[in-house]
Amino acid sequence: MSGLTVSIRGRNGAFAIEAGFAAEGGVTALFGHSGAGKTTLLKMIAGTLRPENGRIAVGDFTLFDAQKGINLPPEKRRIGYVFQDARLFAYMSVKRNLTYARWAGHRPATRSFDEVVALLGIGHLLDRRPSTLSGGERQRVAIGRALLSDPALLLLDEPLSSLDHARRQEILPFIERLRDESHVPIVYVSHEIDEVARLADQIVLLSAGRVTASGAAADIFPLIDAESEGGGVLLEGIVSAYDERYKLAEIDLGGASFQLSDAGLKQTMHVRLRVRARDVSIARKIPEAISIRNLLPVTVTGIERGEGPNAHVFLDFRGRRLGARLTRRSVDDLGLSVGDQVVALVKAVSVDRAAIREK
């Protein structure tokens, strides 16, 4: 088994969908606004909705092939499905919910019960009923049940959408552990940018039933930012130095570097940085006596002016893309044009803590 390959066309009532992408492993996020076709696509992968033509496969395991007449029923696809609501058996204990999944899978176990329980931190919940669990706990149990069915692929359909912010923060580290330790490809449906930034290895953008872009998270994430105040770019790096006196970490981005204050970082840690366009300003030259630590020499690669007061300036920083959201007045006052060499002032950098990995 390996990654997921999808190339299909079909309909869900009057809604038409045409999707093609390949995901090598890790977490593939299906991202788009409500009604973009994310759940419809997930149903076609799961086998509860039949495409009109095309092919779906996990590695060399074919789930659907219209040309060859293959359309495996859902129970034969080796897919674990986690919904927005946990859908646990209310009359069963947590332990029985989990062991039922193993029985229903009808396959030899590749993961032990204890391994899955430890991975998701649910050992203390085994004797309880679903009605006594918090929303985050129920979703962790639902993920455990899906994992114990020995899936070749996990489909998570907005699993955090019914949870408040605190519960989301509670469960995200467990989904990250699942990504890093289970070795099962995951398709993760969401319209929350923060979740995608934190979890995704690959991103598939959907709009009106069509894939508009797909690829590595760092490459696709800037496309989300063009439409949202909350987006930005993702930069992968390694902590190359740490100043104990000032609690400043230096992040090596492959020839370039960032400085940020974070007492939890240590040398050799791999981290994912998120730089939002709203946190980037532009100057014609390096300012004197300024508190901002990250002053980066960049090249203007594009300017997108909206009808409102703002403009988006696309920047290149040693082969890495950045963006700055400025007012149109600022763009005109600076006289910016494509090809200009300017300085990006990065006012804030966030570290996606789940993306921190010690090597």
UniProtKB/Swiss-Prot annotation:
PROSITE patterns, sorted: ABC_TRANSPORTER_1, ABC_TRANSPORTER_2, MODC, MOP
The chain positions of domain ABC transporter read 1-233
User: Which Gene Ontology cellular-component terms appear in the entry?
Assistant: plasma membrane
This entry's Gene Ontology molecular function terms read: ABC-type molybdate transporter activity; ATP binding; ATP hydrolysis activity
Task: List its EC numbers.
Answer: 7.3.2.5
The way it spans or sits in the membrane comes to: Peripheral membrane protein
Under the heading InterPro entries, the entry gives: AAA+_ATPase, ABC_transporter-like_ATP-bd, ABC_transporter-like_CS, Mo/tungstate-bd_C_term_dom, ModC_ABC_ATP-bd, Molybdenum_import_ModC, Mop_domain, P-loop_NTPase
What keywords sit in the KW lines? ATP-binding, Cell inner membrane, Cell membrane, Membrane, Molybdenum, Nucleotide-binding, Translocase, Transport
Q: Which residues does ATP bind? A: G32, H33, S34, G35, A36, G37, K38, T39
Establish whether keyword Translocase is in the entry. Answer: yes
Q: Where in the cell is it found?
A: Cell inner membrane
| Chain ranges of the Mop domain | 289-355
Reactions this protein catalyses: molybdate(out) + ATP + H2O = molybdate(in) + ADP + phosphate + H(+)
Q: How does it assemble?
A: The complex is composed of two ATP-binding proteins (ModC), two transmembrane proteins (ModB) and a solute-binding protein (ModA).
Q: Say which family it is in.
A: Belongs to the ABC transporter superfamily. Molybdate importer (TC 3.A.1.8) family.
What is its biological role?
Part of the ABC transporter complex ModABC involved in molybdenum import. Responsible for energy coupling to the transport system.
Stated name of the protein:
Molybdenum import ATP-binding protein ModC
Q: What is the species of this protein?
A: Brucella abortus (strain 2308)
